[in-house]
Amino acid sequence: VCCLSLLVCGCEGKGESEELPFSPYVEAFTSGTISRYTPVYLIFNQEIAVDRMEPDQLRDLVKIKPETVGEFAFENNRTIVFKPSKSFERDTRYEVKADLSEWFDTERKDKYFSFRFSTQPLLLRANLQSVDINRKNENGYDIVCSVFTPDREIPETVESLVRFSEKANARWQHSPDGKRHEISISNIQAGTD
């Protein structure tokens, strides 16, 4: 009765794992697969001198590719954060490259530090929650399905991906975090087979 148009993710299986970058000045950084709405962090293992913390220079010293609208800022004297204006693109691999020589007395090999992260793809997973006999029609069923997404999605995006093989009166409820979407369909007629 209910037919979902699910997006299929093309998974690239790589035999070897990528080695994490190292810098004697870096304590932590964003890596792995993140939400499109998550800020990106670069955390140093020592403080940046106050006279070297010039917010206006951050755009020149730290680059993100592919280029993304947003803002780099000093969160404190050890942390740089990038917050996208709206969101990162779905299912995209990003690289951040920072010139550390403006903040630390680096050796030539440690002048630049770069790291990568990826964003979640648009995927749907549906679970049938319940099938009950309709109270007003013993030949009809009430069905409830939950649709889960790995990242926050707006209701219009999820609803546009779900199709029905028959005319149905569907009611949607979406969780505040945008990752759980519940659909209720009332009085689906029983099949004749």
Regions of interest found by a model, annotated:
Residues 1-7:
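Bacterial N-terminal signal peptides
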